[in-house]
Amino acid sequence: MDEFHRCGKEDSFWQQCFLYPLFFKEDLYAISHDHYLDVSSSSRPMEHLSSNDQLSFLTVKRLIGQIRKQNHSIVLFVNCDPNPLADRKKSFYSESVLEALTLVLEVPFSIWSKYSVEGMNESKSFRSIHSIFPFLEDKFPHSNSILDARIPYSIHPEILVRTFRRWIRDAPSLHPLRSVLYEYRNSTENLQRSIIVVPRVNTRFFLFLWNYYVCECESILFSRLKRSSHSRSLSHGSFPQRTHFHRKIKHIIIFSRRNSLKSIWSLKDPKIHYVRYGERPIIAIKGAHLLVKKCRYYLLIFRQFYFHLWSEPYRVCSHQLSKNCSSSPGYFLRVRMNPILVRTKMLDELFIADLITDEIDPIVPIVPIIGLLATEKFCDISGRPISKLSWTSLTDDDILDRFDQIWRNLFHYYSGSFDRDGLYRIKYILSLSCAKTLACKHKSTIRVVRKELGPELFKKSFSKEREFDSLRFSSKAAARSQRERIWHSDIPQINPLANSWQKIQDLKIENLFDQ
C-alpha cells in the first residue's frame, strides 16, 4: 500500500482505473485487521478481546471469493463469524472488510487532495479549527449579513456512488461500495430509502464518507461562486475611513478611463467569505439584501440539483448582524459599533476625529449553558445547584478534578467574550454542586465540607483565573485589554457542550418554520 501511494502524479490514471484488483490481496485485509485491533484495543480493555478477534485467512479467502463472483449479498452488518459471542451486535470481520474498503477508496482521494492543495494559489484556505475565531474577527465586522446553513445528513446511497464515479474510473471497484451502502441502509430500517452520513460515528469508513461528502459539496460550491464573483479578496483593515473612501471613488470613476474601471470597481464588489465548523457552514456576505436572498436561494437549488436533496427552508437561515445574533461554535455572535477617538496634532493645534469601526461581540450563552447543566443533573431548570448523585461513588480527588475540569473548559473557551459576568453564575452553580456532592457522599452538610476543604474547591481553576485577570488588568495592559481579547480555543474539550445547545437552537428554528 505504501508503494502504491508513492507512485505519484504520473501513475494517478492507473490508480484510478485499476483499484479493483486490490480487493483480492490478502495483505490488504491483514492491514485493516491490525488497524481495527488498534482502534478496538484503545476503546476496550485487553481482557474483553476474545479469540474471535483473531484474523482467519480462511474467512478472508471466502470473502474474496464472494467479491470475485460479484456477489452483491455480502453480509457485513450482521454477525458472520463462525463462533460468535451471543452479545456481540457487530461482526468482527465486517469491520475488517469495511476497513479494507476504506483503504482502497482513500488511495485516489489522498493523491487528489495532495495536488489540489499544492496547486491552490488563487484563494486562501485555512484548515485549522483554531483559525475560526481570527476569521470571525477579521471578516464578520465587515459583513452585513450571514447565511447559517446546515449540511444535510440524509442522502440516497446511489447519489454517493455517482459522486464517487466522478473521481474513480474503475467501475468494478464501486460494486462493493454500493453493496455496503445498500446493506447498511436496509439494516438500519430506514423508511426514507436513504442513509445517514454523520461525522460522529467512530468508524473509519463513515468518517471517510463524511469527509468526502463535505469535500464534494464545497468543491462544487466554490467553483460556482468563483464563476459568479469577479471581486478580489481585499483587506478592509487598510481602509479605516472606508465611508469617505467610497465617496472619493464616485468622483474618480467619472474621470477615469474604461481600462481602469475594473481595478476601482473591484473595491465595491460584494465580498463572500466562507467558514465551516463541523456540519455548520457559515457564509458572510457584504452586499445588498437582494444578494443575500439570491445566495440563500442558490444554496437550496444547489443541493436539490447536484445531490437530489429537498432542503427544508430552515436549514439555510439569513441574519443581519446589526439586528440579530447568530450562533457559531458555542457563542452568540453579533456586530456592535465601536467609536474610536483619534487625536492628531498638527502645527501646534489639536484636531479631534471620530472613527466608527465595527467589531465582533461574542456573547456567552448563559441560559443554554444552565439548561445543559440541568440536563446533566448539576442544577435544576431554574439554575439552583443540586448534588451529582452519580459521582458520589468516586473519590474526593476525582470529584474535585471533574468539577475543576468543567469549569476550566468553560472559562477558557468563553474568555474571548468581553462580557463574562454570566460565567460567575456558572461558577457559583458548579462550586455549590460540587460541595453538595461531597456532602451527600460523606453524609454531612455543605458548611462542614467548605470548612474542611476550604480553598481546595476549584483551586486549580481559581489560580488560572487569577493569573488571567492579573495579566488582563495589569497597569501596563489595562488600556490594551479594552481593545483586545484572548482566545484560548479549547475546542476539543467544549465541543459536546457547543453541539448540544446548538441542537436546542435548531429545534427552536424548526418550530418557527412549522408554525
From Swiss-Prot:
The organism's place on the tree of life at top rank: Eukaryota
Location (main, coarse): plastid
GO process annotations (BP): mRNA processing; RNA splicing; tRNA processing
Keywords of the record: Chloroplast, mRNA processing, Plastid, RNA-binding, tRNA processing
Function: Usually encoded in the trnK tRNA gene intron. Probably assists in splicing its own and other chloroplast group II introns.
Gene Ontology CC: chloroplast
Location in the cell: Plastid, Chloroplast
Keyword tRNA processing part of the UniProt annotation: yes
A Pfam family assignment: MatK_N
Protein's UniProt name: Maturase K
Organism: Pinus clausa
MF terms in GO: RNA binding
UniProt record similarity statement: Belongs to the intron maturase 2 family. MatK subfamily.
